[in-house]
C-alpha cells in the first residue's frame, strides 16, 4: 500500500498538470447546473505584483484592488518612517520595487503550526505575503497585505499583542511613490516629479518654500540638484527678486515649508536661524514641536487616540538667545492651544500628522467581505454539500484562522485540524491558471457544455466535395496534376486551369464526389501543382485528429484573375477562363470556409499567421479537417496488455493517448495567456465528457409553485417575458441559461394550438351545419306553411348551440393547458431537476392556460367571432318576437 505522505495532492500540482487533474477528476463529479459562487470567481493578488505586471490584476475585483492599494500606501508610509516596525521587505523607488534581502523584523511569536507549503504558482509578492501570513501573526500579515475591515458584522476581530495605527481613506500614495519621471536626487524620500520635461508646479512651489530656509552657502547646491533655475524660467519666476524669508515663528504666514525641511532636507542642507519674537531659538526639537503643534492643532486629539502616551501640554518652553546673546527661556501659552512633544521621532510624527490631515479631508474606503482575508464561518463551511467541499478544496487554497495564546494565526485548514486546533474562520484563495481563476474556468466550461445542442453532433460536412468532373474526367485531371512540377507560380496556375477547361469541354456524366480519405491528398496535389506554398500540420483536439493545411498566398478570385493576367492573358481572356473553370475555382475558393467561429479560433492557433516583409499578400488560406479518432487509437492497448497485476491495471491510464494530447493543448492555452472555458471544452476528449453527470439529482421543483411565480404578471404577452419569468422561477435551483429551451417549448405549444384550432373549427362547422338545417326547417314552417313556432323553441335551439360552443372551447382550453404543462415538465426535466408534486390539480390547469393564453389570444378571438357569426345568422333567420331574450356571450 502507498504511504499516505507519498500521495500527490492537487495543491502540489501546477499549470497544465493541475488543470488536467481538475478537469478529469473534479469536473465529471459536478453537475452541469452547478453554480459557482461569484465571490470565488476572483482572487487576491498583492498590489506590488499588479504594479509589476498589470495583467495579474484581471483576476481580482477592481474595487477591492483599488482599496488595497490605498490602504497599502498608508501602511507603507507608517512602516518606513517608524523606528520599530520595518515589516515591509521592499523599498519603493521611482518606477521599481526593490526587495530588501536582510531579514524582516517580524514577531518572535511565530505560528505554532509549521507551514510546509511553498506556493510557487503564485506571483512573488503574493507568495511572500502568504508565507508571512502562515508564519507570523494574522494581524501583521493583514498590515503588510493592506487589509481593510468590511462593512457589516460578518468578519473577525483578530487578536494581537500590539496593534498599529489603522487609517483608512482614498489616496494615491503608492502611485506617487512609484512615479517614474522624477529628479535623481540624493534624497529619495522627496519625489520631485518631472511633467512634460520640467519640474511640476506643485513641487517647484514646495521647493521654493523650503529653499528660503536653507543657508546661502547651500542654496546653489540645492538649486543644481533640483534644476531650480530651469523651472523658474519655465514658470516665469525671478529667483533674485524673491522676498526675504520670514524666519520669526510669531509672524510666519505658514509653517508648512519649515516642517517639510525638517521632514526631508534636515540631514543634507543647513538651515538659517529661526527666531521667536526676535530671539533666536536654540534647539531644533523645540522649533519642530512648536511648528507642528500650531499647524496640526485640530489633529492633536486624534493623535492622542492612537498614541495615548505622547506628551501633550498647554504650554511650551522655548530656549532662546536675545540679540545680545543672553539666554532667555520663553514660555508660550495660548488660549485653547495644546503643544505636543514628538519625542525626537520627527519624521514619523510629521508623516503621521500628514496622514491624519489627509484622512480628515478624504472619504473612507468601503469594501465588501474578502474571501481571502475574512472568509466564511467554520460552521458555515462544514454545512456545505459534498460537491461544494470537493470543488472548493480542489480549486482554492483553503486556510483557517484560529486563536492561540490570545493571538490569531492563519494556517492551512488541514494542518489546523491535524494539530487538533479549532478553526474560527475559513479563508479561500482561488488558484490562477493561464491568467484566469480556476473557479471561473470551471464555471465557463460547465456553461459551454450545458449550452451545446443535439444539432451540433455530428457536425455535417458542408464543404464542396467535387470539381464538376465525372469520375473519368476527374481521374484524367488527377493524373495531369501529378505531372505538373517545377514551374513558375503564374504559369502553373494558367496551365492547370486550361487543362481543366480542356477536360471539362468533353466531359459527360454526373460530378464525381471526392472520397473523404482522398480529400486531403487531392487538396495538397492541386494547390502544390499550381505553385502555391502548401504546408500541413496535424494534431489532436478533443477526440479528433485535426489536419491544418496552410496555403500561401491566400486563394481568392481576384488573386487568380491577377495571376492569369500576369501570364499575357487579357482581362477578358482571364474572365472567360474563370467562367469556364467555375466549378474548379469555386472548389478552390470555398475550401477554407468556416461556419463555426470557435473551431476557427482553435484551429487557427495550430497555424499561426506568417509575416512577409513588404508583401501585400501576407495572408494565407487555412483548410481544417477533423476526423474522429478510432476507439483503438484512443485506448492505451500497450499499457493494458503489459499490466500483470490488478494494481498495475488500475494505475494504467486507459485513454492515455488522447489525455496526453489534452494536456499538451492545455499547456498551449495556458502559455497563450488567453485561456477560456470554451477552449477547455473544445479540447476535452470524449472519455471525460462521457463521465460528466447532467444534474446533481437533488434539485426539485414544484410545478404548482412554479406556475404561481410565473402567472403573477398578467400582461406577459411576449415570449421573451414568459421566458424571463420561467428562468426566474428556476433560478434558485439551476444555473443554466434556458432561454432557447423555454422559447422552443412555448413555440411548440403555440404551433400545437394553431393545429388544434383548425380541428376545432372543422368540427364546429360540421356541428353548425346541423343547427343551420334546424333553423332552415323552422324558417320553412313559418314562411311556407304559415305555422308559428314559439320563441321558447327557438331560444332553446340557440341555447344548445351556445352550450356546444362553450363545451368545445372548454375542451380546447383543457387541451392547450395540458400541452403547456407538458412543455413546463420538459423544461424542468431538461434543466436537471425533478418534480416533487404528487398530482396536478384543476387549479394547475387554470394557471397553465392563463400562462399560454396571451400567445394564442388571436386564435381564441377568431373562434369566438366565427361562433358569434353563426349564432347571429341563425338568430336573424329565426325571426324571434323577443330578439333580446337570448344573446351570445364570450369570455
UniProtKB/Swiss-Prot annotation:
Gene Ontology MF terms in the entry: structural molecule activity
Entry PTM: The precursor is cleaved by OPG083 to give rise to the 62 kDa mature protein during virion maturation. Proteolytic cleavage of major core proteins OPG136, OPG129, and OPG098, which occurs at a late stage of core formation, is required for production of infectious mature virions (MV).
Key words of the record: Virion
Domain of life: Viruses
One cellular component (GO) term of this entry: virion component
Pfam families the record matches: Pox_P4A (PF03395)
Coiled coil: none
Positions annotated as propeptide: 615-697
Residues carrying the site annotation Cleavage: 614-615, 697-698
Main function: Core protein 4a is the most abundant virion protein. Major component of the virion core that undergoes proteolytic processing during the immature virion (IV) to mature virion (MV) transition.
Record note on quaternary structure: Interacts with P39/A4.
UniProt family annotation: Belongs to the orthopxvirus protein OPG136 family.
Identification of the protein by name: Major core protein OPG136 precursor
Native organism: Monkeypox virus
Gene: OPG136
Amino acid at each position: 500500500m502507498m504511504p499516505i505522505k507519498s500521495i500527490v495532492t492537487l495543491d502540489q500540482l501546477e499549470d497544465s498538470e493541475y488543470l488536467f487533474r481538475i478537469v478529469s477528476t473534479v469536473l465529471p463529479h459536478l453537475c452541469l447546473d452547478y453554480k459557482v459562487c461569484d465571490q470565488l470567481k476572483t482572487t487576491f493578488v498583492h498590489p506590488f505584483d499588479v504594479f509589476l505586471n498589470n495583467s495579474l490584476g484581471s483576476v481580482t475585483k477592481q474595487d477591492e484592488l483599488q482599496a488595497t492599494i490605498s490602504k497599502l500606501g498608508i501602511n507603507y508610509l507608517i512602516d518606513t518612517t517608524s523606528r520599530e516596525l520595518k515589516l515591509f521587505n521592499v523599498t519603493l523607488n521611482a518606477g521599481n520595487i526593490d526587495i530588501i534581502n536582510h531579514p524582516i523584523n517580524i514577531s518572535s511569536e511565530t505560528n505554532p503550526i509549521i507551514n510546509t507549503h511553498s506556493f510557487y504558482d503564485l506571483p512573488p509578492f503574493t507568495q511572500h505575503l502568504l508565507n508571512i501570513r502562515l508564519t507570523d501573526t494574522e494581524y501583521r500579515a493583514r498590515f503588510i497585505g493592506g487589509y481593510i475591515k468590511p462593512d457589516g458584522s460578518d468578519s473577525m476581530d483578530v487578536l494581537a499583542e500590539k496593534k498599529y495605527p489603522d487609517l483608512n481613506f482614498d489616496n494615491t500614495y503608492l502611485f506617487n511613490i512609484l512615479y517614474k519621471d522624477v529628479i535623481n536626487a540624493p534624497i529619495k524620500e522627496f519625489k520631485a516629479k518631472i511633467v512634460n520635461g520640467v519640474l511640476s508646479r506643485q513641487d517647484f512651489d514646495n521647493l521654493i518654500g523650503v529653499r528660503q530656509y536653507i543657508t546661502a552657502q547651500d542654496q546653489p547646491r540645492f538649486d543644481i540638484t533640483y534644476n531650480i533655475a530651469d523651472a523658474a524660467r519655465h514658470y516665469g519666476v525671478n529667483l533674485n527678486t524673491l522676498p526675504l524669508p520670514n524666519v520669526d515663528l510669531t509672524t510666519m504666514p505658514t509653517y508648512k515649508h519649515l516642517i517639510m525641511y525638517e521632514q526631508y532636507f534636515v540631514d543634507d542642507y543647513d538651515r538659517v536661524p529661526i527666531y521667536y519674537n526676535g530671539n533666536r531659538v536654540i534647539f531644533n526639537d523645540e522649533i519642530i514641536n512648536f511648528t507642528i503643534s500650531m499647524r496640526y492643532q485640530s489633529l492633536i486629539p486624534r493623535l492622542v487616540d492612537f498614541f495615548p502616551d505622547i506628551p501633550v501640554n498647554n504650554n511650551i518652553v522655548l530656549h532662546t538667545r536675545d540679540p545680545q546673546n543672553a539666554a532667555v527661556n520663553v514660555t508660550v501659552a495660548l488660549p485653547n492651544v495644546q503643544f505636543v512633544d514628538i519625542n525626537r521621532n520627527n519624521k514619523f510624527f510629521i508623516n503621521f500628522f500628514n496622514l491624519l490631515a489627509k484622512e480628515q479631508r478624504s472619504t473612507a474606503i468601503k469594501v465588501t467581505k474578502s474571501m481571502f482575508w475574512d472568509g466564511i464561518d467554520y460552521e458555515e463551511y462544514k454545512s456545505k454539500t459534498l460537491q461544494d467541499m470537493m470543488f472548493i478544496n480542489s480549486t482554492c487554497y483553503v486556510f483557517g484562522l484560529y486563536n492561540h495564546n490570545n493571538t490569531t494565526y492563519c494556517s492551512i485548514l488541514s494542518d489546523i485540524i491535524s494539530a487538533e486546533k479549532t478553526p474560527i474562520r475559513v479563508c479561500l484563495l482561488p488558484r490562477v491558471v493561464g491568467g484566469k481563476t480556476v473557479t471561473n474556468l470551471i464555471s465557463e466550461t460547465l456553461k459551454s457544455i450545458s449550452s451545446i445542442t443535439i444539432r451540433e453532433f455530428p457536425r455535417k460536412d458542408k464543404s464542396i466535395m467535387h470539381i464538376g468532373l465525372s469520375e473519368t474526367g476527374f481521374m484524367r485531371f488527377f493524373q495531369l496534376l501529378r505531372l505538373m512540377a517545377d514551374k513558375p507560380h503564374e504559369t502553373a496556375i494558367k496551365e492547370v486551369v486550361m487543362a481543366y477547361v480542356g477536360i471539362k469541354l468533353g466531359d459527360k456524366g454526373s460530378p464525381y464526389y471526392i472520397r473523404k480519405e482522398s480529400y486531403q491528398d487531392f487538396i495538397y496535389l492541386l494547390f502544390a501543382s499550381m505553385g502555391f506554398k502548401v504546408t500541413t500540420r496535424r494534431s489532436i483536439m478533443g477526440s479528433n485528429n485535426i489536419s491544418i493545411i496552410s496555403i500561401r498566398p491566400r486563394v481568392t478570385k481576384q488573386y487568380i484573375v491577377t495571376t492569369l493576367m500576369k501570364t499575357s492573358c487579357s482581362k477578358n481572356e482571364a474572365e472567360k477562363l474563370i467562367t469556364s473553370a467555375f466549378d474548379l475555382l469555386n472548389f478552390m475558393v470555398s475550401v477554407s470556409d468556416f461556419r463555426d467561429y470557435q473551431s476557427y479560433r482553435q484551429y487557427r492557433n495550430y497555424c499561426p499567421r506568417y509575416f512577409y516583409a513588404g508583401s501585400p499578400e501576407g495572408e494565407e488560406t487555412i483548410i481544417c479537417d477533423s476526423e474522429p479518432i478510432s476507439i483503438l487509437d484512443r485506448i492505451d492497448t500497450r499499457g493494458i496488455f503489459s499490466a500483470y497485476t490488478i494494481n498495475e491495471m488500475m494505475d494504467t491510464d486507459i485513454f492515455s493517448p488522447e489525455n496526453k494530447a489534452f494536456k499538451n493543448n492545455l499547456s498551449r492555452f495556458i502559455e497563450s495567456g488567453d485561456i477560456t472555458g470554451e477552449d477547455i471544452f473544445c479540447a476535452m476528449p470524449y472519455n471525460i465528457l462521457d463521465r460528466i453527470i447532467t444534474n446533481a439529482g437533488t434539485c426539485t421543483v414544484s410545478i404548482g409553485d412554479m406556475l404561481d411565480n410565473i402567472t403573477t404578471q398578467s400582461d406577459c404577452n411576449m415570449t421573451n417575458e414568459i421566458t424571463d419569468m420561467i428562468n426566474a422561477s428556476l433560478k434558485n435551483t439551476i444555473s443554466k441559461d434556458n432561454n432557447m429551451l423555454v422559447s422552443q417549448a412555448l413555440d411548440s405549444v403555440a404551433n400545437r394550438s394553431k393545429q388544434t384550432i383548425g380541428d376545432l373549427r372543422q368540427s364546429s362547422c360540421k356541428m353548425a351545419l346541423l343547427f343551420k338545417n334546424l333553423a332552415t326547417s323552422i324558417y320553412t314552417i313559418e314562411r311556407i306553411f304559415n305555422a308559428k313556432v314559439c320563441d321558447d323553441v327557438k331560444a332553446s335551439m340557440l341555447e344548445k348551440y351556445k352550450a356546444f360552443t362553450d363545451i368545445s372551447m372548454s375542451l380546447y382550453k383543457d387541451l392547450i393547458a395540458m400541452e403547456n404543462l407538458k412543455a413546463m415538465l420538459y423544461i424542468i426535466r431538461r434543466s436537471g431537476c425533478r418534480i416533487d408534486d404528487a398530482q396536478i390539480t384543476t387549479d394547475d390547469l387554470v394557471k397553465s392556460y392563463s400562462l399560454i393564453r396571451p400567445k394564442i389570444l388571436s386564435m381564441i378571438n377568431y373562434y369566438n367571432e366565427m361562433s358569434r357569426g353563426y349564432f347571429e345568422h341563425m338568430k336573424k333567420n329565426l325571426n324571434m318576437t323577443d330578439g333580446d331574450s337570448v344573446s351570445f356571450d364570450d369570455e
